[in-house]
Amino acid sequence: MIMTESRAVIHLEPPAETSQEQADLLIVKVEEEDCSWMQGYNRPVLETFYQRFKHFQYHEAAGPRDALSQLRVLCCEWLRPELHTKEQILELLVLEQFLTILPEEFQAWVREHHPESGEEAVAVIESIQRELEERRQQIATSPEVLPQKMVPPGATQESFSHQCLPVEAQPERESQNLLEENALPVLQVSSVPLKDSQELTDSLLSDGPQKLVKTEDVADVAVSFILEEWAHLDQSQKSLGRDSRKEDCESTTPVDYEPKEGNLEFTVQQVSDAADPHWVAAERTEKNGVQRPESGEVSDLKDMVPRWQVNPTSGNPRQKRPLRSGPDVNRKQKSNGERGHRCGDCGKFFLQASNFIQHRRIHTGEKPFKCGECGKSYNQRVHLTQHQRVHTGEKPYKCQVCGKAFRVSSHLVQHHSVHSGERPYGCNECGKSFGRHSHLIEHLKRHFREKSQRCSDRRSKNTKLNIKQIPGLSEADLELSGEVQRNACQAEGHSEGCEHQDGQQGVVMKETLGQSSSKRTDCNEFSYVHKKSSPGERPHQCNECGKSFIQSAHLIQHRRIHTGEKPFRCEECGKSYNQRVHLTQHHRVHTGEKPYACHLCGKAFRVRSHLVQHQSVHSRERPFKCNECGKGFGRRSHLAGHLRLHSRDKSHQCHECGEIFFQYVSLLEHQVLHVGQKSEKNGICEEAYSWNLTVIKDKKLELQEQPYQCDSCGKAFSYSSDLIQHYRTHSAEKPQKCDACRDSTCQCPHIKQQQKSCPSGKSHQCNECGRGFSLKSHLSQHQRIHTGEKPLQCKECGMSFSWSCSLFKHLRSHERTDP
């Protein structure tokens, strides 16, 4: 509905006791306003779906099954489970039940505001209660306010014309001011002498079945009158009432407004405060409509929208008094055609009062929602609800792919990108994509640091001469110099606020011209990196090793390396870690969770980096290349090992075959191949040993630390797995046998792989005997029993064997027989 300035003038026929002359004095001025400010909200649509679901009848369906299916469809249209979360659906159900249990005088009022949450509904009711309480207090403290409001203080005793003048007869300027300032239906009394107007006031106060003797009764009557009338209003009138409450202030007359003689105005609320409500109600029921003098149309008495504001007179102008006063509240006026709440601190605009109240807590620091467990406070109830799940352990948002649960729905959305491989956040500079927005922000900071470094290098070359020292240089030349410098930066794609443009020349120019250096504008939200520190600067430095970091959080994590602090402890096994992400990865060892699955072969991993390394197996990609020989590798660790070949450190070399090793232990393991050669003297133990497995193991024990010691015999081991296996010799537990050779004392790599794998997961089965194996390689070795294959041969005697462990045992027999 388009806002118009039309006004309807309605005669009110008084009771039989009043004279026809007094009936001609009452004129109602109604302003038609726009009632579409709530359009576009989802709440009215949801209300429609709710009413359809609530009022569905059984006879509307073809049968019980059809009725049940239609109810399900209507319920889904109302609750929208595919769009709304579980919390939103619960909030909607609680809101509908809350509106149902409200008193009847509040239900219609609150529903017309279309609250979207229980908090908004409570805010509307509290606002109504505060306004009603203010009206009671105002009437209780000023009993004489009613007669004074109805008589203008500046009126004279002159005799006026007794003719009823329509509102259109008023001067144009005064009519326009009233339309703009007073969005109220006004009872206007024209051409009434002061004496007659006083008689009219006394008549209104005295007529009716009962007389008002207490000001408290007047306030109660006003409240009951308002709530009764609200239920009988049409949509446009209710919207008009909402707009007046949304403005939260009383109507005022402009300061320059001076009423003409014979022009006495007072609002409907003054009549409802002064007159008996039963008279008003009876008059409404008896008179269904009254004649408009200019159009002849019939209008109901209920078209008068009850208001609580008072229309002041020229003798006592009053300013608007907002119900929620404060310097931070700045509302948009009706002249702009907008209604809402604007924050006085940051300028943000909100249509709903509840959103504005939540936003104000950011500036005030108010946190009304407190956790009863730990005492933490939050400014929104939803944040408290999410925090309480930390204490209860509730994780309602579960991934349907891997079963992982989360406390917050946004974390589940981010987790879905792990399975889908989606990277929606792309960098406009290099085209690289990321799965999370925070990762994109960190990546963009690197680009800005690179640009800052280029600007710094360019500035160091071009700003060695201070242009302020050049004699005869005018202000125009300074401006031209700065413009040239800015164009050079813009040509390279730098932001407007880069340090190069506001470098030494720019500062000198601004100081010379007396301009402020605060006019720097940035074209990107991440350009604060320029302002925060100089290009390439790492302000956070470690006092122990001197390493620098850009962010203080990284420095805190780094210091834990020196202090040995490990604040993140596993409750299952007691292990501690210095970073939370490491603890999260460790938890997956206990839970068996492997959220990172390969979409090609289905293999899952606990850590994302392991999945990335695994994917190079399918793609045959070798991103890590050697700069010396050009050889590529799929893993960085493999490249690091290869680079040692090109280094000068080649001290560990096999004297038999010439192969080079960078670790002495690797050389010892390699020399097992040469066990058939003559024995050498052990330089570490000063004893003569043959090059067999015993010597190699003893040398490894001497070269390495042995922190794991047996409590029974005192034997020490380098690895915890060796200690666990040693414990079996003291206990009655039988050690696990090798799947290939069925030997419990076997130390070949097969038994180690077998111990790591799950015993129950033997997916590879032998077709001959039905025996199962956890690894396919074990099955291949086992099948040599049925086929009789012996691929391993002794070079000394030519004897063949099926397994490598059997060959090692045979080689030891040759060592004992050697002289």
Swiss-Prot record:
Biological process, per Gene Ontology: regulation of DNA-templated transcription
Keyword annotations: DNA-binding, Isopeptide bond, Metal-binding, Nucleus, Repeat, Transcription, Transcription regulation, Ubl conjugation, Zinc, Zinc-finger
Domain SCAN box, residue spans: 51-132
Presence of keyword Glycoprotein: no
Localization of this protein: Nucleus
Region (Disordered): 236-263, 283-340
KRAB domain boundaries: 216-287
InterPro entries registered for this protein in UniProt: KRAB, KRAB_dom_sf, SCAN_dom, SCAN_sf, Znf_C2H2_sf, Znf_C2H2_type
SUPFAM superfamilies per the UniProt record, alphabetical: beta-beta-alpha zinc fingers (SSF57667), KRAB domain (Kruppel-associated box) (SSF109640), Retrovirus capsid dimerization domain-like (SSF47353)
Primary residence: nucleus
GO CC field: nucleus
Key word Transcription regulation present: yes
ZnF start-end (C2H2-type): 341-363, 369-391, 397-419, 425-447, 540-562, 568-590, 596-618, 624-646, 652-674, 708-730, 764-786, 792-814
PROSITE patterns on file: KRAB, SCAN_BOX, ZINC_FINGER_C2H2_1, ZINC_FINGER_C2H2_2
GO molecular function: DNA binding; zinc ion binding
Biased composition (Basic and acidic residues): 240-249, 329-340
Superkingdom of origin organism: Eukaryota
Glycyl lysine isopeptide (Lys-Gly) (interchain with G-Cter in SUMO2) crosslink site(s): 214, 246, 302, 700, 776
Covalent S-S links between cysteines: none
Tissue expression per record: Testis specific.
Function: May be involved in transcriptional regulation.
Similarity comment: family membership: Belongs to the krueppel C2H2-type zinc-finger protein family.
Protein name: Zinc finger protein with KRAB and SCAN domains 5
